[in-house]
Amino acid sequence: MRKRQQSQNEGTSAVSQAPGNQRPNNTCCFCWCCCCSCSCLTVRNEDRGDNAGRPTHTTKMESIQVIEECQNPTADEILSWAQNFDKMMKTPAGRNLFREFLRTEYSEENLLFWLACEDLKKEQNKKVIEEKARLIYEDYISILSPKEVSLDSRVREVINRNLLDPSPHMYEDAQLQIYTLMHRDSFPRFLNSQIYKSLVESITGSTSET
């Protein structure tokens, strides 16, 4: 009986000594646009996807490709994106903003695939090339992937042949096809989106005030 009471008292003591409602002190910045690389943007976008009722799928390559670090773009740079898709895609800030828009259209995988191909082109180690080529296939080419990109049969045949001997440029045809799709299909809607218009209004407004 004494042992039972003793164990109960110890349990009560342990509970009383446990920390209360302590929360980690996670500070977060308030970004002026999506070009910031802080974690608050990632969480906000994930919540937006959950609220939309669409299940989110994290691919193996996407875990590497978080929001790219970059400096805030100048007003001239932001305005120039409307005239030149290539120029926007060459800047991390432009890609980050475009990626946020694609996420609202559930086509973020197109940009992620393009970025993964760019990353593969930089590799020289054969083992790393083989591993990254395999991950790209599993994440974006395989029909079993929830983030499969839209490619025609000819390009798929080329990819299947290239898998026998992976190289840094094995996805070049597929990358060009997806790049063209984003340019012709997604980019015009991006320029008319609230995401881009709000950013333009914010920088033009601040410029006129100064």
From Swiss-Prot:
One of its GO terms (biological process) is negative regulation of signal transduction. N- and O-glycosylated in synapsomal membranes. It is found in: Membrane; Synapse, Synaptosome; Nucleus; Cytoplasm. GO terms for cellular component: cytoplasm; membrane; neuron projection; nucleus; synapse. Keywords: Cytoplasm, Glycoprotein, GTPase activation, Membrane, Nucleus, Signal transduction inhibitor, Synapse, Synaptosome, Ubl conjugation. InterPro entries: RGS, RGS_sf, RGS_subdomain_2. Residues 84-200 form the RGS domain. Its main location: membrane. Transmembrane segments: none annotated. Residues 1-21 are annotated as: Disordered. Interacts with GNAI1 and GNAQ. Interacts with GNAZ and GNAI2. Forms a complex with mu-opioid receptors and G(alpha)z/i2 subunits, including GNAZ and GNAI2; the formation of this complex results in mu-opioid receptor desensitization. This is Regulator of G-protein signaling 17. It comes from Gallus gallus. The gene is RGS17.
